[in-house]
């Protein structure tokens, strides 16, 4: 009787707070399979549950997406901000699969019972503990999301983004040119507004548990990209909203952007999302695509419709974050997912079962992180997340106490080198993962390229150093170095010119516009023509900054129809047809707005653009004098060291015959005695050559001298013989005359 009452209570709670999630109930008592190894038991767990009498074996590994400084912020009735650290939640989260369905996804919290999601091929289940149960009973329910019949994004956001990256399946040659995925980390700050707080239970720990559960599932989805979605902190507007949440998502987004600039500046995050409950919204999301590293647009709105549950809401957030990191929605005729629903498919929100990113999404993401700067996703050392102290084997990230980490069973390409279950090397092999590990489980020889240059003047190729399976950090020309024959500057590894920027937007032949165009479009106080925003209001540029505001281009007439009329602005100025685009209509993959001139673009003698202002180059850290430090035989790199020209050796670029140049940072050199020599350059044979040359040079000189003397003697003898013959001839003639 007590169990029935508990089940009815749990059923009522699910109906009240889980939206349209199905109530197809099963009761199960999970059974944990114990391990003799306590260390392995903490990182990996096995549970057996039953659904409809069928046993399922869940293999789980530790999932880390909450940092040690994770806080939950709330406001009291007087408006004061308070924070709580739910430290007990840090070690609860696991992800894995059901052995009976190897392609399944399982995401669970194991503290105070099992709570989370089980996604099989075409069906999803939720599992939660029965409160006050003495027998560890849990309920399992089939999760169903009714079609919310709403768009994910407003037309003015999604349409403009999609026109910049049309649907197409990339050629294999294009994919091969993109670099391999490296571990990255996206730090997200979540805010829950009052209506959603009430809808999810109106209690701090209950709401926190649900949001952590949602982000845990989102993080599981993004592991395909080796991208860890870290929930930096959670803010609950439990008493009243700090901004108005009326209107559509894009209206709320503008208000939220202005609010976060003032109130979230000291709280670490790469992007912030406001979660809003709306019973029947027109669309359920608003964000700026490709802006994850842009502090002016690093925000989004996700609406929770009444028609979906936590799983569907997780997909909404995953799709929005996907747009932030360069993804587009899938064309179902050209993009596919093997035995799963594609996450960037519009129907994924209402679909049940396993969800993964498509081949198109994979290409979009690889392009995003390969071709442009995404440094905000690489600052793991500043986050100090949980998995830094507690490594997770199988996530493809080499962490403390791991000898190798080649990913999970399906991802690992070094199975004969690395045990993907324990992250230990097999036998006496040298390595088991990383770009500088060979298929023979050996470290790549020093001097093997591991990261190609993306700019011939401003970026440098990196090499394996022969002692590590990882590639050395990226090296490029120090910001402020002249490039393109002195008409541009290097900035973050790229030669920044308005011609290149215009060509990327409007096609081949487009160029930076004359000064008159820049002056015109950056002096008007309008939304499409400005030098940035303040309190959500557009600002005209100061005269000194007009070359650093909106990007103005001129394009050939044959390309004039290639741009989207809804986002392109045409101006006729002094016999020039100037072209620009609306702010927010197109984003660079480094997170900056294509509408503006890129940072590092020259705006005057010894000046370049930074954050829409024209600044002197020497004020921006150009503290390495290549003329003195590198003796004029190299340039300064981003580590403040010399990148020497061929024929000169680092660190000070002294002349050395045969040296390929380079720096002490690019992985191609090691210190040997009092000078640097290139690894991979065969110094052994070089020394033998010099020694042999010194030994045989005297013999060569003697031999040459002997040959020379011999020739001289031979010539002298020949002259004497010729003279003798001539004299003999004269004597003979005289005798003939006498007779």
UniProtKB/Swiss-Prot annotation:
Residues 390-479 form the Disintegrin domain. Changing residue 344 to I: In a cutaneous metastatic melanoma sample; somatic mutation. Residues 1-16 form the signal peptide. It is a single-pass type I membrane protein. Changing residue 536 to L: In a cutaneous metastatic melanoma sample; somatic mutation. PROSITE patterns: ADAM_MEPRO (PS50215), DISINTEGRIN_1 (PS00427), DISINTEGRIN_2 (PS50214). Residues 709-739 are cytoplasmic. GO terms for biological process: binding of sperm to zona pellucida; cell adhesion; cell differentiation; male gonad development; proteolysis; spermatogenesis. GO terms for cellular component: membrane; plasma membrane. The keyword Transport does not apply. Sperm surface membrane protein that may be involved in spermatogenesis and fertilization. This is a non catalytic metalloprotease-like protein. Residues 184-381 form the Peptidase M12B domain. This is Disintegrin and metalloproteinase domain-containing protein 18. The lineage of its organism: Eukaryota, Metazoa, Chordata, Craniata, Vertebrata. Keywords: Developmental protein, Differentiation, Disulfide bond, EGF-like domain, Glycoprotein, Membrane, Signal, Spermatogenesis, Transmembrane, Transmembrane helix. It comes from the Eukaryota. Glycans are attached at residues 36, 76, 122, 149, 156, 177, 294, 359, 465, 561, 611, 625. Residues 17-184 form a propeptide.
């Amino acid at each position: 009787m007590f169990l029935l009452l508990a089940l009815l209570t749990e059923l009522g709670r699910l109906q009240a707070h889980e939206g349209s999630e199905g109530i197809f109930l099963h009761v199960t008592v999970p059974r944990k399979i114990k391990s003799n190894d306590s260390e392995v038991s903490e990182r990996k767990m096995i549970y057996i549950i039953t659904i409809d009498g069928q046993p399922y074996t869940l293999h789980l590994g530790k999932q880390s997406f909450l940092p040690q400084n994770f806080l939950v912020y709330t406001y009291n009735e007087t408006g004061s901000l308070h924070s709580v650290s739910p430290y007990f939640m840090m070690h609860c989260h696991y992800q894995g699969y059901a052995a009976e369905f190897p392609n399944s996804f399982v995401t669970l919290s194991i503290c105070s019972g099992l709570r989370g999601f089980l996604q099989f091929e075409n069906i999803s289940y939720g599992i939660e503990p029965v409160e006050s149960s003495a027998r560890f009973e849990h309920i399992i329910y089939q999760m169903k999301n009714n079609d919310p019949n709403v768009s994910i994004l407003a037309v003015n956001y999604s349409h403009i983004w999609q026109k910049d990256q049309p649907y197409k399946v990339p050629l294999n040659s294009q994919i091969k040119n993109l670099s391999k995925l490296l571990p990255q980390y996206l730090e997200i700050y979540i805010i829950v507004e009052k209506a959603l707080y009430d809808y999810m239970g109106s209690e701090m720990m209950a709401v926190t548990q649900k949001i952590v559960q949602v982000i845990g599932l989102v993080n599981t989805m993004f592991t395909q990209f080796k991208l860890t979605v870290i929930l930096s902190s959670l803010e609950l507007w439990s008493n009243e909203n700090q901004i108005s949440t009326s209107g559509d998502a894009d209206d709320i987004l503008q208000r939220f952007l202005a609010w976060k600039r003032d109130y979230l500046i000291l709280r670490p995050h790469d992007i912030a999302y406001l979660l809003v409950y709306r019973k029947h919204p027109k669309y359920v999301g608003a964000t700026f695509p490709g802006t994850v590293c842009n502090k002016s647009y690093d925000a989004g709105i996700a609406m929770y419709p009444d028609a979906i549950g936590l799983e569907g809401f997780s997909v909404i957030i995953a799709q929005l974050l996907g747009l932030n990191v360069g993804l587009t929605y899938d064309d179902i005729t050209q993009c596919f997912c093997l035995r799963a629903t594609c996450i960037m498919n519009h129907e994924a929100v209402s679909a049940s079962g396993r969800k993964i990113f498509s081949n198109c999404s994979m290409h979009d993401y690889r392009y995003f992180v390969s071709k442009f700067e995404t440094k905000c996703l690489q600052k793991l050392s500043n986050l100090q997340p949980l998995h830094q102290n507690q490594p997770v084997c199988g996530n493809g990230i080499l962490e403390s106490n791991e000898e190798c980490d080649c990913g999970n069973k399906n991802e690992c390409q070094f199975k004969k080198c690395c045990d993907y279950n324990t992250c230990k090397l097999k036998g006496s092999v040298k390595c088991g993962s990383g770009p500088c590990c060979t298929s023979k489980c050996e470290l790549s020889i020093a001097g093997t390229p591991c990261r190609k240059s993306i700019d011939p003047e401003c970026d440098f190729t990196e090499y394996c150093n022969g002692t590590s399976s990882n590639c050395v950090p990226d090296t490029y020309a120090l910001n402020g170095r002249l490039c393109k024959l002195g008409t541009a500057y290097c900035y973050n590894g790229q030669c920044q010119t308005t011609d290149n920027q215009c060509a990327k937007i409007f096609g081949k032949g487009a160029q930076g516009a004359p000064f008159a165009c820049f002056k015109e479009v950056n002096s008007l106080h309008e939304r499409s023509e400005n030098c940035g925003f303040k309190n959500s209001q557009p600002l005209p540029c100061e005269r000194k900054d007009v070359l650093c505001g909106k990007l103005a281009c001129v394009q050939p007439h044959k390309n004039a129809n290639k741009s989207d009329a809804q986002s392109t602005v045409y101006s006729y100025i002094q016999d020039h047809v100037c072209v620009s685009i609306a702010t927010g209509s197109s984003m660079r993959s480094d997170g900056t707005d294509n509408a503006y001139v890129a940072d590092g673009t020259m705006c005057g003698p010894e000046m370049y653009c930074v954050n829409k202002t024209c600044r002197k180059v020497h004020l921006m850290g150009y503290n390495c004098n290549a003329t003195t430090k590198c003796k004029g035989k190299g340039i300064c790199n981003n580590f403040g060291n010399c990148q020497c020209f061929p024929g000169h050796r680092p660190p000070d670029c002294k002349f050395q015959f045969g040296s390929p140049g380079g720096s002490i940072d690019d992985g191609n050199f090691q210190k040997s005695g009092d000078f640097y020599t290139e690894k991979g350059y065969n110094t052994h044979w070089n020394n033998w050559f010099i020694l042999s040359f010194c030994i045989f040079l005297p013999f060569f000189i003697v031999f040459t001298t002997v040959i020379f003397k011999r020739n001289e003697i031979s010539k002298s003898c020949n002259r004497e013989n010729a003279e003798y013959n001539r004299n003999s001839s004269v004597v003979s003639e005289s005798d003939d005359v006498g007779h």
